């Protein structure tokens, strides 16, 4: 069975019950993805429910005052996310006739939406063939295929992105992408992964070669040394 089929099978049996998965509405998926940036899942669920209660749809967010959005965002930090949400909501509401863009190319041109979020929205909501690439996906791909390219270098990112695209199934792109994210959070965790429960362990290069704890690889950062200089000034009759 192919890797993508195994992930879909696992997802069908083990997917997490998350509030934004009860809908395919791009507004809800967008809000959840932005909130979950730099935010733990438990905290993200709380803030998502609170945000949707206050701003249940695009119109309510677009027609609100920015100060109200920022007030609701308190505790999440990175306030540029909230400002970008408000800006993009107004743009879609006033300039796109409230119609959320469906394609990756349109989505990525919106303020605050990058490669990952554009791929997630287009695949989950509109079944567009796009691969997500986040920490979970980097980790899964690196371990399964034994890829030792540093995940935090731009050139390496292209390698992982190509592999992620090649692994896409023939359908159910959104479910597959969400399956990867869940699999990385529950099974192929950064620390203490559940390799004994992993249905891909027999195919996993890292597992077969005891490399699980060393993959994925991050580039070594040069330590910045602080240099101190002492100066001695001798004044000899103003000469």
Regions found by a protein language model. Name each.
Residues 4-194, 200-211:
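Catalytic cores of DNA base-excision repair glycosylases
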Residues 213-239:
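N-terminal strand-loop-strand
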């Amino acid at each position: 069975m192919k890797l993508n089929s195994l992930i879909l099978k696992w997802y069908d049996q083990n997917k997490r019950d998350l509030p934004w998965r009860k809908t395919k509405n791009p507004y809800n998926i967008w809000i959840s993805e932005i909130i979950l940036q730099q935010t733990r899942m438990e905290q993200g669920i709380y803030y998502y429910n609170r945000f949707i209660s206050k701003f249940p749809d695009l119109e309510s967010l677009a027609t609100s005052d920015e100060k109200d959005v920022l007030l609701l965002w308190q505790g999440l930090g990175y306030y540029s996310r909230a400002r970008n949400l408000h800006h993009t909501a107004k743009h879609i509401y006033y300039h796109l006739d409230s119609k959320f863009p469906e394609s990756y190319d349109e989505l990525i041109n919106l303020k605050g939406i990058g490669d990952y979020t554009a791929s997630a929205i287009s695949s989950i909501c509109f079944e567009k063939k796009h691969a997500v690439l986040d920490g979970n996906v980097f980790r899964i791909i690196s371990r399964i295929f034994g890829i030792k390219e540093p995940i935090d270098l731009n050139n390496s990112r292209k390698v992982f992105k190509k592999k992620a695209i090649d692994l896409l199934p023939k359908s159910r792109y959104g479910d597959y992408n969400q399956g990867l994210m869940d699999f990385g959070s529950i099974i192929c965790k950064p620390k203490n992964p559940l390799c004994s429960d992993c249905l891909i362990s027999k195919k996993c290069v890292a597992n077969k070669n005891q490399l699980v704890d060393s993959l994925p690889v991050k580039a070594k950062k040069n330590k910045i040394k602080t240099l101190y200089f002492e100066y001695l000034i001798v004044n000899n009759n103003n000469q």
